[in-house]
Amino acid sequence: MAVLTGTAKIRFGVADTADDMEENTHGHGREEGGIEVEAGVGDVFILPAGTAHKTFDTSPVTEFKLLTPGDGHHILTKGSDVRETLANVQLDGFTMVGAYPKGGGEWDFATGGENRGEYERVWSVPKPENDPVLGKAEEGLCGQWR
C-alpha cells in the first residue's frame, strides 16, 4: 500500500469486534494488540497476506470512495486500456493505493470478514519476483521472505 495524498492513521494486526464505527475505531470495539501509525504522502506498507488493517482519521476529510472504477475486485475500463483509465483518476482527500504481486492470484477490496476460514487461500500468495520499492535487494521482500 502506498499513500498518494493526505494523511491518516492506520491500525495493523487487529480486527474490529463491534459493529459501531465509533466504538471499533476510537473505543474498545477491537481485538487487543496491533499497532497504529501516522501515514503520509510517500509512505509504503508491505503486509503479509491476511493482515488486518484499518484506515481512519483521514485528512483532508472526504467521503470514502474506491480509487478506481469498479467493484473492488477489478478495474472497470472503457474498452481494455487500464493505463488510460488510471491516468484519468482524480486524486483528492486521503488517497492510498494497494497492489498485489504479479501472478499473486485474485485481489479484492475487502471490508472485513469476507475471507474468514479461508486461511490456506489467503496465505498461499506466492513470493513476488521483485519488491515494489527495493527490487531484488536483500533488504526487501526478495531477501526477507523465507
Task: Please provide the spans of the model-predicted regions.
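Short, solvent-exposed loop/turn segments at secondary-structure junctions
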Residues: 11, 19-20, 54-56
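Short alpha-helix capping/helix-loop boundary micro-motifs
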Residues: 30-33
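Conserved metal-binding segment of the jelly-roll/cupin
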Residues: 38-59
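PEST-like low-complexity intrinsically disordered regions enriched in Ser/Thr/Pro and acidic residues
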Residues: 25-26
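Short, surface-exposed beta-strand-loop junctions and turns on beta-sheet-rich folds
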Residues: 16-18, 61-62
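Double-stranded beta-helix
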Residues: 58-146
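Small-side-chain structural scaffolding
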Residues: 2, 8, 39, 52, ...
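Short, conserved beta-strand element in jelly-roll/cupin
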Residues: 1-17, 46
